[in-house]
């Protein structure tokens, strides 16, 4: 990221389509075409991992396995693994702009089960699946077993499974369950084959058209995950895999009680003793999917907020030293120089800044944050940005521009309008996007909602809440000629064009 360029943040879930949720189908290829046409370089997405409670891509059943909601059904029909009759009449939800996750899950499962049977019955495809299974043996079998056993126990979280011997991976218990659940285990293996096959085709298409994929890696793992089940020694857990300490961030101006994320805390001493092998593996697997990798909550590698496991708020936590540069030194030694972006937002201190400098990764800048202080002294105001950074209007955790602007005070709105030289009648989204692309940051990333001038209810996520997040989808036809021309204009005007 050492030259001026730009891109768009748009998660797969938010792509339009007929089956209730975005996928790796034609709409994704059309989106690549849109990026190419508007001279973009990057497509930034959120984690592709399988989602769990709350539908958050940052709370996953696995650090590696893919979200099977993204498998495109039309492509399965094209490839003769499904028929149109298999999907006809299924209820994926009625609202094309907001995802109904319960309906999507219920409708897709029996359809995907039919596709799995067709693949296993096709000798050529079954052979490809077996090759995939062998290539990914270091994680796939454990994941498929975890998901099958989880379903066997009515989809309860790992810590609530009825048979505690299964939680503790008793050998005889697991052998019995493997035999009993063999068909379900195979299902979970095959749908992973489909996920990775379709993603590889889409990524190849993006790369062939000059578009690089920026992926995302959460720092933490869900307590209800295959990693906690198979490698409990790497986390601070009790004998039943329940977290003794959980992750979050302390109270601040935006949250009086802090944020309680609920993820188990790493036993960093155990990771160090194993030369951070799990982290090397995890990052290596990520770069099989992406060209660049945003690492979430980079502060947590410097110091992390550790909260007692039973607490209901983040108030009683404390800062505990993280692994620091020791981890990234090993990653560099094992994997070489990597295209990593550090999410360095929030409680950033000199120690974290030093870690970022030692690693050499670009950090992030959020344009919205610069205008709460109307004196011009904010550390987030655009005139203090540096070239070695990635600038955003906002991320998935922030308000869309229209919602953000509406919630400013009149003084803040007046200051913002004057600072960005907003023209009479100019939409605030366009004025702020223009400001973003004009910054000295080598990389500028615009959220799709802002390009489309969407209202407040299109926000992707409201941190520390569950139930109404990760739902927004773009509607067919929303990318108008006018919007494409505007994006192309600011991209070329500020020397970010990918020619």
List each language-model region with its residue ranges:
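Surface-exposed amphipathic alpha-helices with a cationic face
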Residues: 36, 199-207, 332, 356-357
